[in-house]
UniProtKB/Swiss-Prot annotation:
Compartments it resides in: Cytoplasm
Entry protein name: Protein-export protein SecB
Domain of life: Bacteria
Purpose of the protein: One of the proteins required for the normal export of preproteins out of the cell cytoplasm. It is a molecular chaperone that binds to a subset of precursor proteins, maintaining them in a translocation-competent state. It also specifically binds to its receptor SecA.
Amino acid sequence: MTDQQNTAASEEETAPQFSLQRIYVRDLSFEAPKSPAIFRQQWDPAVALDLNTRQKALEGDFYEVVLTLSVTVKNGEEVAFIAEVQQAGIFLIKNLDAASMSHTLGAFCPNILFPYARETLDSLVTRGSFPALMLAPVNFDALYAQELQRMQESGETPTVQ
């Protein structure tokens, strides 16, 4: 019985573990440089989305992942608004090989954070009295694969700061 308990405990210690600890807004900004005049114009928006992720090792097996979404919306040639959110999360991640850890931090965690960031941006934009901002889902696995390929071609290796 004791051998079975020791084996189970040993397997539990080496089994991959993933746990979301906390999701929070790290930074938030909104600018509407042409208000109130922009509200009196015909609305024909052009949306430009920039996104970025970064990871940081914390103490032990904890990691912070930050997803930054920056949106610039132009109405004709004028900037209607600029909104940015840094949506962050703290994750407990244990017992993953280097490739799995890189994928988890570079694609899986940002995928978890995106709906929160999208909702925060939408709320911010509507509070600025603009129409709702409905951002399409993002394929973080594809973005991660592209970044991996770019890094391999340039001889870089993925790192966690």
